[in-house]
Amino acid sequence: MKHILKTVDHTILKATTTWEDIKILCDEAVDMSVASVCIPPSYVKRASEYLKGKIKICTVIGFPLGYQTTATKVFEAKDAIENGADEVDMVVNISDIKNKDYDNIGKEIKEIKKAIGDKVLKVIIETCYLDEDEKIKMCEIVTMSGSDFIKTSTGMGTGGATLEDIKLMKEHVGKNVKIKAAGGVKSISDAEKFIEAGAERLGTSSICKILKNEDTTDY
């Protein structure tokens, strides 16, 4: 079980999240020794003070639709790092993918990576909205742009990670880019299959329920 837990970004990104929810999430994360907590940007500073370095903090920018301008995303990223984030999950502009404006996407990723330096960047491509050719192209763009991870989903779209997507990403992404599966991890079996297929990070808000074999309907 430890090999699964060390890949987990223990996540809470729902609109109604309270500070009490964040504290519970952080305590659970410490107890389970997961990879990180993934939380809203507005809670990063308080969570950093609360955790005192016990667990890495991940947050999101351009979330969940990716429509923010590059300048806005860069500001969000810098602000998150200044407040104590160790990792940043950014959403690309899906419209840019549909418009085949890949140069703009690559430039944006590079600017955000430059802004956060040696902190970890994960690029969310929202696979549920993409066809196979678009997914392959985004693997290439993310690889060339210097991101640390490519991530399947926000968990807010029409679908989450699939085993087929992870296998496709593993085939086409560069060897220096890791894969994060998110929004589709509903059981221990799911987690094991995603890891076996090539995912090195799992984003889920359901890990506690998964460990108890309870129903999982959340992100």
Swiss-Prot record:
UniProt KW Membrane keyword: no
GO biological process: 2-deoxyribose 1-phosphate catabolic process; carbohydrate catabolic process; deoxyribonucleotide catabolic process
Keyword presence, Cytoplasm: yes
Gene Ontology MF annotations: deoxyribose-phosphate aldolase activity
EC number(s) given by UniProt: 4.1.2.4
Pathway(s) where this gene product acts: Carbohydrate degradation; 2-deoxy-D-ribose 1-phosphate degradation; D-glyceraldehyde 3-phosphate and acetaldehyde from 2-deoxy-alpha-D-ribose 1-phosphate: step 2/2
Catalytic-site annotation from UniProt: D89, K151, K180
GO cellular component, one term: cytoplasm
Broadest EC class assigned to this enzyme: lyase
Family under the similarity heading: Belongs to the DeoC/FbaB aldolase family. DeoC type 1 subfamily.
Protein name (record): Deoxyribose-phosphate aldolase
